[in-house]
Design a protein with these regions (language model features):
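ASCE RecA-like P-loop NTPase motor cores
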Residues: 1-185
Length: 185
């Protein structure tokens, strides 16, 4: 987790602005936010909380102001990962620190087994495709208009797997070796 927080801090230092950081759970989100706050208390941050009401959601989104700076921590697949419009400088980048897979459960295992029996690719249909839909949806918070440019950090080693890469949009310019400091394409 130190590496993940270091990437967030370095990207923020090199390109100050508004960012969203997405995590697989509230526990993971809380741990990462606490680590960033401990090591870099100068970086403003705000967090999605479980069961946020309308007013709390509005307050979270109000933190994204033109020429603002900070990191909003949210859960991938949650209320801030889709249906949120933050064009231009309201949001200049996102960090996705998870592949977004559905948690293991008996129901999910049965669904995957059924799809595997029918199509021979149960894991892909039941797990990977929905996960990548959530990732693309969250990434879409950064690019809201044709003029928007920004950074998207996929901070999970599983994004290097061929079966995952082939599910990402073809127009994404992927650079597995890119480090903080680069300009957006």
């Amino acid at each position: 987790m130190q590496r993940l927080v270091a990437v967030i801090a370095q990207q923020f230092d090199e390109h100050p602005g508004n960012y969203l950081a997405f995590f697989s759970s509230f526990a993971y989100l809380k741990s990462a936010a606490a680590l960033l706050a401990e090591g870099r208390p100068d970086i403003p941050q705000w967090r999605q909380e479980p069961r946020m009401g309308t007013d709390a959601r509005a307050e979270f989104l109000a933190r994204f102001r033109p020429e603002g700076q900070g990191v909003g921590f949210a859960v991938l697949g949650g209320v801030f990962a889709e249906g949120v419009d933050l064009p231009g400088s309201l949001l200049i980048g996102a960090f996705i620190a998870t592949l977004g897979l559905i948690p293991v459960s008996v129901t999910q295992d049965h669904f995957q087994a059924r799809l595997d029996k029918l199509f021979g690719a149960g894991h892909g249909y039941a797990d990977l495709v929905p996960a990548m839909q959530r990732v693309v949806q969250a990434a879409g918070r950064v690019l809201r208009t044709p003029e928007d440019r920004g950074w998207l950090w996929l901070l999970d080693d599983r994004y290097r797997r061929a079966e995952v890469v082939e599910l990402l949009p073809a127009w994404w310019q992927l650079d597995a070796a890119r480090q903080p400091g680069a300009s957006p394409p």
